[in-house]
């Protein structure tokens, strides 16, 4: 870009140098500044393009770039200007860029002032060239800025610029358009510098006129000439300031005139309208130079026809008229009128413009008309006679537009400013006007009236006294007649006539205020106009005019000769008639442009003529009335107040005439005026009022009666307005004539009763049978109106009879249609109001109250409840409200009944539609009457009880499903709350819970779907809060008040979420104001109303419950049970899941803060568990942490039954320790476990829960341990419980669910395979099942062994027997867990304690078993605890209590001995050996079994130290061992044989240790062989022992066990066979024989057979009588 600019600059320099030899090529002085300016220009160009594209304003970057260039120019102007000039010389530069550069150059020139001459020359040359190029669309803009640049340079370099322009301005050579434009700009901006060049410039331009054929160059020349002439005029005015050689005004005029002539004669006829307009605009400044010249002025006149010809063209005529006005006005000023020969042409052309409607294209028609008027005024001053003659000729055309236009011109001429028009001109003008007064067209009449008024205003009053006033009177009468008899079809004519009347009134006002010496005839005409006209809008100006005239006459100013000798009083009609007329008209003082003040002023002026006695009073009173009207407008005044003032004025006036018949005559006039006004109207209403007041002051009762009867007969009772007016008139009359009024009514009733058969009056005509009811309605209201206006002392004597009695009679004796009902209600209201208004009623009892009440109640009940067709019910309730204030008062029951009936009658009505205004009014009145009645009835019981009864009556409507019923009920509630709050003088505290109940009723309505209901509910709530605050002396903080106001605003929203949020915030704000009791009552009411309406109401209720519980839960410890009960009672009836869930969430919220109370209350619910209660627990299960907490608490409840009862130290303890049904507790646990996530293994309390359930199951198997409270809980089961719902089954189901969570298939399989659940369910096998379950838990429930062990130890230490038993059964001594968890010692101590107790056998057995199991679980610790173990296990052997205990003791010893040595056993070995042998022959198979096993274990343990002792024990035990080897109990027999063979070695005989014989031989045979061998050995080695064995054996023949008896017989035989003779001889054979023979009687044949065999052996031994040797016996 820079290179292109440089090349262009050099090329341009060469070109310019050809034109200017003194300018050399440019040099670059500062390449940095040059480049910066170029870059800034690029920014300007780019931003300009963006601005053009987007349509946005000037960009900030463009402005900033321009500012930077300007700052650069401040420091380096030449460099910047040269750079900009170079940029202009680029060949293909855009037009916009050139425009931007020229604009910057203009700013720099303006900023810097003088520049370097070389720069200026170069810039002038370039700008001149740009300006003179053929302008295209964009080029025109470029030429314009180039021209502006030259003008800017001319301020400091005028000569250079002027030289350049003059160089291109050559005679007879048409120059460029912008050269002329620029010269005009130079002349305008440099007046004095340009003047020396003005002459040559004008002369040169004149030579170009013939060459200028194009429109643009002609427009440019015209515009330049306009500027040149204005500049010359400025120069001539400031001639003394010029320092250049000057030209005179004449010289300038001579220079201009040729051009003026050429413009008018040639260019003005150009077809182009823009050229024409340019010419016309240039003529005005040119004429400013030409017209002052006397010689040239005459020549200018010659060209006027050419100007007038332009009116026929399309040119805007305003500019032509302005030129003509300039010529005509200067002709008057210079007193050189235009030639008379041109007058007719001027008159005609201008008159046509005035009278004809301007073409649509002429936008300045009104301004043109004003200019025309000035032209005619100028012509009238020069040629008045000729002009009026022309006007006269034009008026003869009979065209309305021509006549109106001409008359308007005459009016303008008459009203011409100084100098005033000549008298001759005025005289001639009036002649023209008089010639047209017979024209009846509206516009012509108005124009004539305007001229008459204008003549009066301009001081020509004498010229209109005759014809003018007469014409005015005629027009006043004519226009009034036409307006009062107008027809609808001729609206346009009526509008025109109204305009004529308005102009007439204005003219009358002008004349009466300015014309002196007014004729009496005109006065009379105006006065009669007031009395007769029906067109009341004309009254104000007429009254003003009359007042002015009357003041002139009364003050003697310019009195007419005909009345000069008369009195100062003004001639008037009858004074009473005039006063009546004016009073009635003044009742609407602002009609007719404020006629009230005008009439008051007239009345004050005529006071001496109307009633001299009232004059002084009227002077004061009327002034006050006028002041009142002046202080108000028709928008601010009060009709009632104004009428009261007029009535008071009338009463004060009548007082001045007291004692005369003046008031009676006035009454007649007022009565006569009634027919003059339509019904309805304010004037007629005031007439009835004024008539009533006037009649009340009448002295002659008979004449008053006549007037009243006349009024009754002539009244049309079908017209409500007239009927009401007569009623009011009678009432007002009753103030002073009550007896007269009642007599008239009675007389009228009798007459119509008589005429009812003959149909003599129109009221009873056959074709209008309904009229009878209309008259009766009017009579009822008349009686009540008489009561309302009657004097209080007279009323008490007349109210029951005849007034109320007549009202009731007329009602019950008619058809009782709607109109009659309304009249009856109005009558009752008026009568009761009148009674209530009496201040001192004393003990007055209204005798008719009961009758009236019954009638009214019947009417209300008869009204339809679904629609509203009349105001009857509203009036009925209003009547009841007034009746309620009279004695005898209604009772409380009657009050409630009236409230209920009235509420039902109104609230059930549906809201009216928006388009039915009449129904809306009826509806509003009914609602207002209901409020008034409720207020009256509430006032009789203004205490909390009355308030509560009122709220109870409204409650069913507040909870209605119909929104319109809710809205009205809540609105009524609000109104009554306001009454209660503001009417209670003494603060009576609400009952406990009443505040909460009322808030609970209304709070959900803040979320109602209807906005008005929400807002009314909010206001009710505010009233309740204010009442509560006043009673509790609590103050609302500003923050709370502000928050409530904000919530109130949010309730107006239509967003449901926003509404609920606002209601929640309200609950949050107010909840702290409630006591705990009030919170309970609130929640109870909210729960009670849940489900009564709709879902939105229910959501709002539970939302409030939730917020109150959330905010106040901690404080409600004593009320939790009541709240929970309220929620649970109503929860089953709630259908919507969301609402149910919110209520349940409220329960859970309470449970978080008062867990024990809630838990106890829930557990005390009846079984089987209802669905809503199950839903509560399901909700608990969804909150896993809380569910765990609840499970802990439930476990605690079960555990508390198995622990000693403790004393409660807190309220929570009381609830925790309260008795609950364990079955409900177990069912709840089962439900929670079932609903919790199956993947949740409940690691934190799984062992506790398992253990607790085991304990519960154990206690259920021991019914004697169950608490007596269970019997009580069985009573609440309303239905029989299912079979599966018992303690054992529910407990086992719960345990099964718990073990499923262990996720061990092997455990589940083992539990089923070993039938653990069946064992646990059966009480007989429970302990076995517990032990088995405990072993399985140790194997499969990893991670919980320590906790289970701890729980077991705690249970073993419990005071509850069942708990100790179950815990001991679970005791994990058979496993290593106790040892591993270092719990072995406490376990041993507890087991030791259990083994010692004697109260329960099972516990002892289990304790011993557990002690014995130490050898299995902690064998290494057996030696440590050997003393305790041996002692506790030996105890049952030493002192046997039961077989099971002894057996368990022996088994435990057996287990223990396995881990001990002989030395460890110590002295206990002897005891064990001795005690063990005792049980060899025990009847219990178990004991025998355990004894044999233990003895065998002892045989293994015995060492060297005890071997000898035990050898003796073996000898002692040998016979039992050999005999019990054949024990009937197979297990015992096997154990015994094993033990026996284990003890054989103690005999020291090797042959016995390995018994001979085959192994497959039978056991009995083996035993026989062993016995035989044993006996043979003993015979040889220890025959004495064998002898003792025989005796011991024979003792067993009497054993209880048959098998033992058989074995004894067989063993005895074997011994006897092996016994030596020596010892045989010692035998007592008889005794032995007897013993064996006794066995022959044994029931067992085997015994008998064995005994027989033994007996045979015995006999054999005794027969031989010798001692057999051992060898022989073998």
UniProtKB/Swiss-Prot annotation:
Keywords: Repeat
Positions of HEAT repeats: 73-96, 97-133, 195-234, 254-292, 382-419, 424-461, 573-612, 615-641, 642-679, 739-776, 993-1030, 1221-1263, 1381-1420, 1627-1674
Region of interest (Disordered), ranges: 1-26
Pfam families named in the record: HEAT_Maestro, HEAT_Maestro_2, HEAT_MROH2B_1st, HEAT_MROH2B_C
InterPro entries per UniProt: ARM-like (IPR011989), ARM-type_fold (IPR016024), HEAT_Maestro (IPR055406), HEAT_MROH2B-like (IPR055408), Maestro-like_HEAT (IPR048465), Maestro_heat-like_prot (IPR045206), MROH2B-like_N_HEAT (IPR056282)
Top-level taxonomic group: Eukaryota
GO CC terms, sorted: cytoplasm
Hydrolase recorded as keyword: no
Protein name per the record: Maestro heat-like repeat-containing protein family member 2A
Species, as recorded: Homo sapiens
Gene this chain is encoded by: MROH2A
């Amino acid at each position: 870009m820079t290179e292109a600019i440089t090349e262009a600059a050099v090329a341009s320099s060469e070109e310019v140098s050809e034109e200017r030899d003194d300018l050399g090529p440019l040099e670059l002085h500062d390449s940095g500044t040059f480049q910066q300016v170029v870059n800034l220009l690029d920014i300007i160009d780019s931003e300009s393009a963006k601005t053009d594209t987007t349509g946005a304003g000037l960009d900030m970057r463009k402005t900033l770039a321009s500012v930077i260039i300007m700052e650069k120019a401040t420091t380096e102007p030449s460099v910047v200007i040269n750079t900009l000039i170079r940029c202009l010389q680029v060949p293909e530069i855009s037009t916009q860029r050139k425009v931007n550069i020229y604009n910057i150059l203009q700013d720099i020139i303006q900023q810097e002032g003088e520049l370097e001459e070389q720069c200026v020359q170069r810039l002038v040359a370039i700008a001149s060239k740009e300006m003179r190029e053929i302008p295209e669309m964009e080029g025109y803009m470029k030429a314009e800025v180039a021209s502006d640049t030259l003008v800017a340079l001319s301020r400091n370099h005028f000569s250079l610029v002027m030289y350049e322009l003059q160089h291109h301005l050559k005679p007879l050579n048409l120059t460029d358009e912008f050269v002329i434009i620029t010269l005009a700009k130079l002349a305008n901006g440099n007046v004095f510098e340009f003047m020396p060049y003005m002459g040559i410039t004008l002369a040169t331009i004149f030579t170009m006129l013939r060459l200028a054929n194009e429109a643009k160059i002609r427009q440019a020349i015209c515009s330049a000439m306009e500027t040149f002439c204005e500049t010359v005029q400025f120069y001539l005015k400031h001639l003394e300031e010029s320092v250049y050689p000057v030209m005179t005004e004449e010289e300038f005029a001579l220079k201009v005139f040729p051009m003026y002539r050429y413009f008018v004669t040639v260019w003005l006829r150009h077809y182009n309208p823009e050229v024409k307009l340019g010419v016309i605009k240039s003529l005005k400044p040119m004429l400013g130079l030409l017209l002052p010249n006397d010689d040239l002025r005459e020549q200018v006149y010659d060209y006027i026809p050419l100007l007038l010809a332009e009116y026929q063209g399309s040119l805007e005529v305003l500019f032509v008229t302005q030129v003509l006005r300039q010529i005509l006005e200067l002709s008057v000023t210079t007193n050189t009128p235009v030639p008379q020969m041109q007058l007719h042409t001027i008159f005609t052309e201008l008159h046509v413009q005035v009278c004809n409607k301007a073409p649509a294209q002429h936008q300045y028609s009104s301004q043109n008309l004003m200019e025309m008027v000035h032209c005619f005024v100028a012509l009238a001053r020069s040629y008045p006679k000729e002009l009026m003659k022309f006007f006269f000729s034009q008026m003869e055309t009979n065209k309305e537009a021509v006549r109106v236009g001409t008359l308007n011109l005459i009016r303008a001429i008459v009203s011409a400013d100084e100098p005033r028009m000549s008298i001759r001109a005025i005289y001639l003008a009036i002649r023209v006007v008089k010639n047209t007064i017979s024209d009846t067209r509206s516009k012509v009449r108005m124009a004539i009236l305007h001229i008459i008024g204008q003549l009066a205003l301009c001081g020509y009053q004498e010229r209109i006294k005759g014809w003018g006033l007469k014409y005015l009177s005629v027009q006043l009468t004519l226009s009034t007649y036409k307006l009062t008899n107008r027809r609808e079809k001729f609206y346009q004519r009526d509008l025109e006539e109204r305009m004529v009347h308005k102009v007439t009134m204005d003219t009358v006002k002008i004349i009466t205020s300015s014309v002196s010496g007014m004729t009496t005839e005109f006065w009379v005409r105006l006065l009669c106009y007031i009395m007769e006209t029906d067109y009341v809008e004309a009254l104000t100006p007429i009254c003003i005019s009359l007042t002015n005239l009357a003041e002139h006459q009364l003050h003697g100013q310019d009195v007419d000769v005909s009345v000069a000798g008369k009195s100062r009083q003004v001639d008037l009609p009858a004074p009473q008639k005039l006063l009546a007329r004016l009073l009635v008209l003044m009742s609407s003082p602002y009609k007719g442009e404020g006629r009230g003040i005008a009439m008051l002023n007239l009345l004050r002026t005529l006071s001496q003529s109307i009633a001299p006695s009232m004059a002084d009073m009227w002077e004061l009173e009327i002034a006050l009335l006028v002041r009142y009207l002046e202080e108000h407008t028709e928008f601010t005044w009060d009709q009632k107040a104004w009428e009261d003032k007029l009535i008071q004025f009338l009463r004060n006036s009548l007082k001045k005439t007291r004692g005369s018949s003046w008031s009676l005559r006035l009454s007649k006039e007022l009565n006569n005026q009634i027919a003059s006004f339509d019904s309805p109207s304010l004037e007629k209403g005031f007439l009835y009022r004024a008539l009533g007041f006037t009649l009340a002051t009448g002295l002659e009762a008979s004449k008053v009666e006549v007037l009243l009867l006349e009024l009754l007969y002539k009244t049309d009772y079908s017209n409500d307005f007239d009927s009401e007016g007569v009623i009011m008139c009678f009432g007002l009359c009753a103030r002073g004539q009550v007896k007269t009024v009642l007599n008239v009514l009675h007389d009228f009733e009798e007459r119509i009763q008589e005429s009812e058969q003959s149909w003599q009056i129109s009221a009873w005509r056959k074709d209008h049978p309904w009229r009878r009811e209309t008259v009766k309605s009017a009579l009822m209201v008349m009686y009540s109106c008489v009561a309302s206006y009657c004097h209080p002392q007279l009323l008490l004597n007349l109210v029951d009879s005849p007034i109320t009695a007549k009202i009731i009679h007329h009602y019950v004796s008619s058809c009782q249609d709607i109109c009659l009902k309304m009249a009856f209600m109005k009558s009752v209201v008026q009568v009761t109001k009148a009674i209530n208004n009496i201040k001192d009623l004393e003990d007055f009892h209204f005798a008719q109250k009961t009758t009236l009440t019954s009638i009214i109640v019947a009417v209300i009940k008869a009204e339809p409840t679904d629609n509203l067709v009349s105001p009857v019910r509203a009036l009925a309730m209003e009547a009841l409200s007034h009746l309620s204030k009279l004695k005898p008062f209604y009772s409380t029951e009657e009050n409630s009944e009236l409230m209920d009936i009235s509420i039902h009658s109104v609230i059930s009505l549906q809201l009216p539609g928006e388009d039915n205004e009449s129904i809306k009014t009826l509806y509003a009145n009914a609602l207002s009457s209901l409020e008034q009645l409720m207020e009256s009835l509430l006032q009789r019981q203004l205490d909390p009880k009355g308030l509560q009864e009122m709220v109870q009556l409204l409650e069913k409507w507040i909870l209605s499903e119909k929104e319109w019923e809710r809205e009205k009920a809540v609105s009524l509630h609000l109104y009554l709350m306001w009454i209660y709050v503001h009417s209670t003088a003494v603060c009576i505290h609400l009952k406990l819970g009443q505040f909460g109940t009322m808030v609970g009723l209304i709070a959900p309505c803040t979320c109602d779907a209807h906005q008005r209901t929400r807002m009314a509910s909010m206001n009710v709530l505010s009233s309740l809060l204010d009442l509560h605050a006043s009673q509790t002396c609590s103050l609302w903080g500003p923050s709370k008040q502000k928050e409530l106001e904000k919530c109130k605003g949010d309730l107006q929203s239509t967003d449901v979420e926003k509404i609920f949020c606002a209601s929640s915030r309200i609950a949050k704000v107010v909840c702290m104001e409630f006591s705990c009791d009030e919170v309970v009552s609130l929640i109870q009411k909210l729960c009670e109303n849940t489900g009564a309406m709709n879902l939105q109401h229910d959501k709002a209720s539970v939302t409030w419950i939730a917020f109150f519980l959330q905010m106040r839960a901690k404080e409600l410890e004593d009320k939790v049970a009541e709240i929970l009960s309220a929620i649970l009672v109503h929860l089953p009836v709630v259908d919507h899941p969301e609402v149910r869930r919110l209520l349940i969430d409220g329960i859970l919220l309470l449970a978080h803060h008062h867990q024990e109370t809630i838990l106890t209350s829930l557990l005390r619910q009846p079984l089987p568990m209802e669905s809503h209660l199950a839903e509560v627990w399901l909700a608990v299960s969804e909150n896993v942490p809380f569910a765990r907490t609840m499970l802990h608490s439930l476990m605690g409840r079960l555990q508390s039954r198995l622990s000693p009862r403790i004393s409660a130290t807190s309220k929570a303890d009381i609830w925790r320790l309260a008795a609950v049904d364990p079955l409900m507790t177990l069912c709840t646990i089962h439900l929670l476990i079932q609903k919790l996530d199956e993947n949740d293994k409940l690691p934190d309390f799984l062992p506790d829960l398992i253990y607790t359930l085991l304990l519960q199951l154990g206690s259920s198997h021991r019914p004697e341990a169950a608490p007596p409270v269970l019997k009580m809980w069985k009573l609440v089961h309303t239905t029989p419980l299912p079979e599966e719902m018992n303690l054992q089954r529910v407990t086992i189901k719960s345990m099964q669910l718990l073990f499923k969570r262990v996720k061990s298939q092997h455990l589940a399989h083992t539990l089923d395979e070993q039938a653990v659940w069946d064992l646990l369910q059966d009480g007989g096998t429970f302990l076995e099942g517990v032990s088995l379950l405990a072993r399985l838990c140790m194997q499969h429930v990893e991670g919980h062994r320590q906790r289970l062990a701890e729980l077991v130890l705690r249970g073993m230490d419990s005071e509850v027997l069942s708990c100790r038993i179950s815990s001991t059964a679970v005791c994990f001594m058979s496993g290593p867990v106790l040892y591993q968890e270092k719990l072995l010692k406490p376990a041993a101590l507890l087991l030791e304690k259990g083994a010692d107790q004697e109260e329960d056998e099972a516990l002892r057995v289990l304790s011993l078993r557990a002690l014995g199991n130490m050898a299995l679980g902690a064998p290494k610790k057996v030696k440590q605890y050997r003393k305790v173990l041996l002692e506790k296990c030996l105890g049952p052997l030493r002192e046997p209590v039961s077989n099971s205990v002894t057996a368990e003791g022996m088994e435990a010893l057996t287990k223990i001995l396995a881990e001990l040595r002989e030395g460890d056993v110590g002295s206990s070995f002897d005891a064990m050996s001795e005690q063990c042998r005792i049980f060899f022959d025990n009847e219990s198979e178990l004991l025998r079994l355990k004894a044999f096993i233990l003895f065998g274990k002892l045989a293994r343990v015995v060492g060297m130290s005890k071997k000898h002792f035990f050898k003796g024990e073996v000898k002692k035990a040998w016979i039992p061992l050999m005999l019990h080897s054949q024990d009937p109990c197979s297990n015992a027999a096997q154990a015994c044989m094993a033990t026996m063979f284990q003890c054989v070695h103690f005999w020291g005989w090797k042959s016995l240790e390995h018994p001979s014989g085959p192994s497959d031989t039978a056991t009995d045979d083996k035993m026989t062989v062993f016995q035989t061998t044993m006996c043979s050995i003993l015979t040889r080695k220890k025959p004495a022992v064998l002898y003792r064995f025989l005796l011991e054996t024979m003792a067993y023949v009497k054993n209880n066990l048959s098998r033992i008896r058989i074995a004894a017989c067989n063993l005895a035989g074997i011994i006897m066979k092996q016994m030596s003779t020596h010892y045989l001889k010692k035998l007592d054979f008889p005794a032995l024989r007897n013993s064996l023979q006794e066995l022959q009687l044994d029931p067992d044949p085997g015994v008998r057979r064995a005994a027989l065999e033994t007996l045979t052996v015995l006999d054999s031994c005794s027969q031989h009588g010798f001692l057999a040797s051992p060898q022989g016996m073998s």
